[in-house]
């Protein structure tokens, strides 16, 4: 039997998909802007 592929880890989640990471690059800021435009309640992990 193989293990489940999703092994939750809050620290890794934030480091890979977090707000500060998104703000770091121009493309990341564009993602946040698009999500704000769309009216998302949560912008990032």
From Swiss-Prot:
Keywords: Ribonucleoprotein, Ribosomal protein. HAMAP family: Ribosomal_bL34. The gene is rpmH. The keyword Ribonucleoprotein applies. This is Large ribosomal subunit protein bL34. Belongs to the bacterial ribosomal protein bL34 family. InterPro entries: Ribosomal_bL34 (IPR000271), Ribosomal_bL34_CS (IPR020939). GO terms for biological process: translation. GO terms for molecular function: structural constituent of ribosome. GO terms for cellular component: ribonucleoprotein complex; ribosome. It holds the Pfam family Ribosomal_L34.
